[in-house]
């Protein structure tokens, strides 16, 4: 009997399913998911070695990367059994609204949620929301994800 995707995952389990590892895997835990939604938590916004942190701290727009990692994880969970998830990239973000200038000053775990609004084999549209532990909005918006699109490197262009 083949087992389906897990209901919950820790940091190591998430890192095995998304294209980031080590400190660049920002998510700590998969809390819940359905074919259309995902809920993850993270405390990496408080870490001094967060790779997105600048001299000014971890700025609010970095919440988009937290949401993007949740979307990538969701894609791996909904992939057909026995197949690899489609590699993808964020093509655009729209209607983004920030409720905090910095994330590193937020106490408690970030609550990261993404909802699949539409999509097909080559693109997916998600709504995302990042809140603090009390539910205060830190960032929200929509993201268009393009799947299975080869990106030429400068070395291969024109070859």
Please describe what each predicted stretch is:
Residues 27-28, 93, 98, 125, ...:
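Hydrophobic residues on conserved beta-strands that form the core of alpha/beta folds
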Residues 2-6, 73, 104-107, 113-159:
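HotDog/MaoC-like acyl-thioester-processing domains
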Residues 55-74, 88:
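Compact, glycine-rich, soluble single-domain proteins
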Residues 73-113:
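Hydrophobic beta-strand-centered segment that forms part of the acyl-chain substrate-binding groove
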Residues 11-21, 84:
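Short aromatic-glycine motifs in intrinsically disordered, low-complexity regions
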Residues 19-26, 104-110:
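Short coil-to-beta-strand transition motifs
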Residues 22-58:
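Catalytic strand-loop segment that frames the active site of acyl-thioester-processing enzymes
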Residues 28-31, 99, 115-117, 131:
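Conserved positions in beta-strands of structured domains
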